Amino acid sequence: MQENVLTGKVALITGGARRVGAEIARTLHAQGMNLVIHYRSSRDDAHALQAEFEKHRPKSVALVMGDLLKVAQLPGIVEEAVAAFGRLDALVNNASSFYPTPVGAATEEQWDDLIGTNLRAPFFLAQAAAPHLKKTHGCIVNIADIHADRPIKRYPIYCAAKAGVVLLTKSLARELAPEVRVNAVAPGTIMWPEGEAEVSAAQKQEMLARIPLQRTGSPDDIASTILFLIRDATYINGQVIAVDGGRTVVA
């Protein structure tokens, strides 16, 4: 494998300031990439991450704030990313909303939020980024979910949005080839959700019992798969890679 093949290349990571997004950023930066980290409300986390990375490599991280629900802002996010370093080699559509919307209680606002962050924003960001990625023969990595085709109760809108991400990934892979590769990662249980989607200890045990490896994954499992798709997978296009400890092979 060629060493430092990513040095000087540029990745835009949405929702890159915390949780899995921060680990993706950490992994790509360690491989020599310059980063544009998008955030909406995690300003302090974003600036802390930038400071951490730039101790090792000054002027290697730019930050861009934006609301992914506002489609008119999305081309500007991409343009800021390109302006920061003069090129764009990878778009990682990581940002996501996740919470229950049981039938009978779901609202139009929840629909707009879940579809907007998980499906609409990745498409319009990809559309804006495509001309720049074609110039560099770059790639797009979307974040799907193993529940895109194995829906979980009480999450119909989220599951529908992620199902859309799967087909969007395959469609973009055809639309943007041969210059741009488009793939997706479908996480299983990686980090326990926060806030409204938080699960009980009993629910955690029930979920773990269905995973052949009998444990959760880590953010590094997702980040290393994304690194593989960006750096090494030059002949992989239109694929969705499950990172789930074997959950999808269990009935």
Functional labels for PLM-detected ranges:
Residues A126, A161, T169:
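Active-site helix of classical SDR
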Residues A177-R181, I236-G238:
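Short, small/polar-rich loop/turn modules that mediate ligand/substrate recognition or access, typified
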Residues I211-I222:
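A conserved structural motif in NAD(P)-dependent oxidoreductases
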Residues Q2, R150, R210, L227, ...:
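Short C-terminal tail/terminal secondary-structure segment
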Residues P131, A173-P178:
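Alpha-helical segment proximal to the catalytic Tyr-Lys
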Residues P102-V103, T107-I115, E196, Q203, ...:
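Substrate-binding pocket helix/loop in short-chain dehydrogenase/reductase
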Residues V10, A17-R19:
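Conserved glycine-rich cofactor-binding loop
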